[in-house]
């Protein structure tokens, strides 16, 4: 399975990403091994996930979520 996730950083901002293992990826973010954006904003909290059968579907959804406003992202969860 392919997943898109939204995490909330310690400064209140949101980060959206793609992974095949959500729990591992969130742990990487919290360990400082995730995206550069989240490294100085730990701890992070998982707020939303969506699962897809194909990587291309997940990547399209990730892009769409990244285009949403903060309020629209919050409506997801």
Curated annotation (Swiss-Prot):
<feature type="domain" description="GIY-YIG">
    <location>
        <begin position="1"/>
        <end position="75"/>
    </location>
</feature>
<dbReference type="InterPro" id="IPR035901">
    <property type="entry name" value="GIY-YIG_endonuc_sf"/>
</dbReference>
<protein>
    <recommendedName>
        <fullName>UPF0213 protein VNG_2274C</fullName>
    </recommendedName>
</protein>
<dbReference type="InterPro" id="IPR050190">
    <property type="entry name" value="UPF0213_domain"/>
</dbReference>
<dbReference type="Pfam" id="PF01541">
    <property type="entry name" value="GIY-YIG"/>
</dbReference>
<comment type="similarity">
    <text>Belongs to the UPF0213 family.</text>
</comment>
<dbReference type="InterPro" id="IPR000305">
    <property type="entry name" value="GIY-YIG_endonuc"/>
</dbReference>
């Amino acid at each position: 399975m392919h997943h898109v996730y939204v995490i909330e950083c310690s400064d209140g901002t949101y980060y959206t990403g793609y992974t095949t293992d959500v729990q591992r990826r969130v742990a990487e973010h919290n360990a400082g091994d995730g995206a550069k954006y989240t490294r100085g904003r730990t701890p992070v909290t998982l707020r939303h996930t969506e699962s897809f059968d194909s990587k291309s579907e997940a990547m399209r959804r990730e892009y769409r979520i990244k285009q949403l406003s903060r309020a629209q992202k919050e409506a997801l969860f």
